[in-house]
């Protein structure tokens, strides 16, 4: 009888389902668990995994941010996506993951800005200015915020399970920065 066991990478990846599990775990390890990013930057990074529908003319295939650390880390993720897409194609593997539109580059800085908003007036202004300019609907934005929250929860569990304390302490602060106005129990939308 054969006994199958997870590799260390596979054990960590088995806790991830909101994003490409192997890419995320490899990326987190190579970036030393995002030690150089703060909570806001982590939100910007995670926003690339949302499916917030930005107006076609304003959509970008490269990271839309002036933050050099984020650009570098997102390019690393993009390279990993290309590598896995190529591997799956070469070995005729059909994982079901859609590599063609797997990353959304347009909401990085807007999501970082969203983290900084303090009250309802600022949130309303953001919705009427930033989201309207990008032609992003409030429903799509809310779903994107909830997706970020779901990814954060997975990463929190990963950090708790494997003892990545520095990242854990950053991640547990994120929901309070993003789940406001459009994505809370008191919100007007949900």
Kindly label every feature range from the protein language model.
Residues 2-35:
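Accessory beta->alpha helical hairpin/"wing" motif in late/C-terminal subdomains of nucleic-acid enzymes
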């Amino acid at each position: 009888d054969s006994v199958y066991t997870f590799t260390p990478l596979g054990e960590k990846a088995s806790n991830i389902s909101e994003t490409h599990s192997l890419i995320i775990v490899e990326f987190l390890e190579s970036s030393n668990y995002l030690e150089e990013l703060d909570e806001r930057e982590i939100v910007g990074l995670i926003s690339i995994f949302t499916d917030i529908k930005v107006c076609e003319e304003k959509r970008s295939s490269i990271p839309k941010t002036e933050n050099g650390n984020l650009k570098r880390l997102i390019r690393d993720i993009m390279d990993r996506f290309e590598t896995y897409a190529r591997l799956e194609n070469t070995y005729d593997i059909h994982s079901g993951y859609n590599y063609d539109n797997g990353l959304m580059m347009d909401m990085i800085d807007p999501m970082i800005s969203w983290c900084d908003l303090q009250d309802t007036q600022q949130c309303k202004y953001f919705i009427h200015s930033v989201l309207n300019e990008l032609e992003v609907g409030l429903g799509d934005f809310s779903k994107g915020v909830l997706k970020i929250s779901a990814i954060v929860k997975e990463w929190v569990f990963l950090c708790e399970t494997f003892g990545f304390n520095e990242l854990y302490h950053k991640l547990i602060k994120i929901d309070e920065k993003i789940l406001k106005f459009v994505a809370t129990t008191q919100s007007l939308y949900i």
